[in-house]
Amino acid sequence: MSIFKGSGVAIVTPFCENGVNFKKLEELIEWHIENSTDAIVICGTTGEASTMTEAEIKETIKFTVDKVQGRIPVIAGTGSNNTRKAIELSKWAKSIGVDGLLLITPYYNKTTQKGIVEHFKAINDDVDVPIILYNVPGRTGLNILPKTLVKICDTCSNVVAIKEASGDLSQIIEMKALLKDRIDIYSGNDDQIIPILSIGGIGVISVLANIMPKEVHDMCELYLKGKTKKALEIQLNTLSLTNSLFIETNPIPVKTAMNIMGIDVGELRLPLCNMDESNLNLLKKELSNHALIK
């Protein structure tokens, strides 16, 4: 059974002077539920987990689970390039009631394809909770190859899905051909939602949903219900805005956009920094063109 179908928001973490702005996070959670977001993915890349302390990560995940109260699935980013650390955080996340885990490939260490399998198997064997793998070689320097994914699925009963952000549609098609319905595929790129749905994907883990939650949900729902032309229209109509959210490293533009829109999510944490002025002007133009600001 799928953890979710449709739009899972890779939600930003709002910060304030004292740390995480939990009042704002609660507002965001309620806003997403009201606007039909299908799942919340907390403490991922867009949530700046890499600049948060372990205590902040745990408090943020628990707060989210407590506030959502089972209304939609909560998926926690508990991956690491330290297998033991990933196991410990994943065990803890299970204990407080998350619906799934998002596990990034082990970055920086430069392990082999065999090492990728063994890393995920170690987590799988110690933590009985649904797992979404996160393949984003542009960030990690490590690509889960299709045949490697087959080996993972053969040995890891809790691995139920993959967030595919390689951008390589040929690779994703090969994954689907090899595994059929043994694993769910989520788009990890907002500009490839429709292409990935068209080859059997079931949704997206989305950055765009932070500012257009209803539109991303509708795009997925329409496609999955067979209304493919209307779904494609949303993809095409939001494409220029989507592209503007990636003119600098995510989540710099999306967090900047939210602040411009009056959704005060606070500052970015170093080493992420404020946008270049020319890129900022382009972002503002796209927000205006899509009626998100006046």
UniProtKB/Swiss-Prot annotation:
The active site is at 134 (proton donor/acceptor), 163 (schiff-base intermediate with substrate). Keywords: Amino-acid biosynthesis, Cytoplasm, Diaminopimelate biosynthesis, Lyase, Lysine biosynthesis, Schiff base. Coiled coil: none annotated. Its EC number is 4.3.3.7. It catalyses: L-aspartate 4-semialdehyde + pyruvate = (2S,4S)-4-hydroxy-2,3,4,5-tetrahydrodipicolinate + H2O + H(+). Pfam families: DHDPS. InterPro entries: Aldolase_TIM, DapA, DapA-like, Schiff_base-form_aldolases_AS, Schiff_base-form_aldolases_CS. SUPFAM superfamilies: Aldolase. Pathway: Amino-acid biosynthesis; L-lysine biosynthesis via DAP pathway; (S)-tetrahydrodipicolinate from L-aspartate: step 3/4. GO terms for molecular function: 4-hydroxy-tetrahydrodipicolinate synthase activity. The keyword Amino-acid biosynthesis applies. One of its GO terms (biological process) is lysine biosynthetic process via diaminopimelate. Pyruvate binds at residues 46, 205. It is found in: Cytoplasm. The keyword Nucleotidyltransferase does not apply. Its main location: cytoplasm. Belongs to the DapA family. Catalyzes the condensation of (S)-aspartate-beta-semialdehyde [(S)-ASA] and pyruvate to 4-hydroxy-tetrahydrodipicolinate (HTPA). HAMAP family: DapA. This is 4-hydroxy-tetrahydrodipicolinate synthase. It comes from Clostridium tetani (strain Massachusetts / E88). The gene is dapA.
